[in-house]
From Swiss-Prot:
Pfam families to which the protein is assigned, alphabetical: RNA_binding
Name recorded for this polypeptide: UPF0201 protein Msed_1787
Disulfide bonds: none
Similarity comment: Belongs to the UPF0201 family.
Organism, scientific name: Metallosphaera sedula (strain ATCC 51363 / DSM 5348 / JCM 9185 / NBRC 15509 / TH2)
HAMAP family: UPF0201
NCBIfam families recorded: PRK00447.1
UniProt cross-references to InterPro entries, sorted A to Z: PAB1135-like, Ribosomal_uL5_dom_sf
Coiled coil: none
UniProt-listed Gene3D superfamilies: 3.30.1440.10
Length: 143
């Protein structure tokens, strides 16, 4: 079973709609909500890998498959893949991976992907390359 949860803090100085745009630039969610707490938290969810198709496309457009593959593989832990991207870069349509929450001044966008075969998910999103070109294009794994 596939489940994808994407979260982003909405800081007091931020426009909620801009945070939603930053998330939606790379993630086609089926449902969303705003949770109240220390910071307001935008939570978007989906139950299909196709919701990451925009992310898949932009990794190729930006030619960052090698870096993305290394970063994504580091985020696999059991049946969960977790990674973060810079929220302000995402708002303008760019993918910039971050290692800690401090690297994105307004907080990162955090992706958590649950899937039975996360290696296949990484192979689909960011396949191995040679001289910057994908060695293959894997089909999207089944949900």
């Amino acid at each position: 079973m596939t489940r994808i949860v994407v979260t982003a803090e909405i800081r007091p100085s931020e426009d909620e709609d801009k945070v939603k745009v930053a998330v939606a630039n790379f993630f086609s969610f089926k449902s969303s909500k705003v949770e109240e707490g220390k910071y307001r938290l935008f939570v978007a969810e989906s139950d299909t890998l196709s919701s990451l198709s925009k992310f898949h496309r932009v990794l190729r457009e930006e030619r960052i498959l090698d870096a993305a593959r290394k970063y994504l593989r580091r985020g696999i832990e059991g049946d969960r893949l977790t990674f973060m991207i810079h929220k302000q870069a995402a708002y303008v349509g760019k993918i910039t991976f971050v290692d800690s929450e401090n690297e994105s001044p307004l907080g990162p966008i955090t992706y958590t992907v649950f899937h039975r075969d996360l290696e296949a998910v990484v192979d689909w999103l960011a396949p191995r390359t040679s001289r910057g070109r994908p060695l293959w294009d894997n089909p999207m794994p089944e949900d």
